[in-house]
Amino acid sequence: GCKNVIAVLSDSGMMGGRVSHEFMLLTAIGEDTLVLCDSCDFKANIEACASVVDNSALSATEPLTLVPTPGMATIEEVTGFLHKPHNATCKAVVYQRNEDDGYVIAFVRGDLEIHETKLRNAVGAELHPAIVTPESGIVAGFIGPMGLDTKKITVLFDRSLDGIGALVCGANKVDHHYTGFNIERDYGKVTYADVARAIPGGICPVCGKPTLRISNGIEVGNIFQLGEKYTRSMNMQYLDENGAL
């Protein structure tokens, strides 16, 4: 049989069900990205791995301040200009739903990236990279939570932002950002989603130690815990030993 095959937690995808596992052949040329913990037995496809961060050192608050950031439209430019760390910024990533082209904006900690499968699952729709038009009211390069039309735009906050007292974020105004942005104080109560990619050295969602590493694999099999997903949807019934439904 194959050596170096492991079972990893996976996304159920179109098959559905609440739990599924893939059997992965570990290899550097594998097309799937896997997250493994060196401190426990946790193993997952990156699309099914919860992203966990520690924001305890970032809890201090500051006054909300509108600051000019002329021509500074990227995280690197803004953090360099304002002398702020990447993990104290609120980065916006914009998508559109395939079904109606409605905009979806996901906010994530500036040193992390969005995982599209996790975002798709959180939104409950297929997505594609956005084409931002003037009519959308979205100011590319300076997008922030405050002032967005949430009747037209679906807004999500990744849980990597939870607990950060003072963030740098876009002001939805060309050449301007806010410093000291506090989500609960300046935006309101939100329900955080898990849509960020896990990273090497990240915190394991099972044992809590910062010992995650990234590997690659080739899928050689898959199992799904489907429960009654298909039997109920197809209205399947059976006769018992007495011939009754």
Describe each model-derived feature in a short phrase.
Residues 1-245:
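Extended, low-hydrophobicity, polar/charged segments
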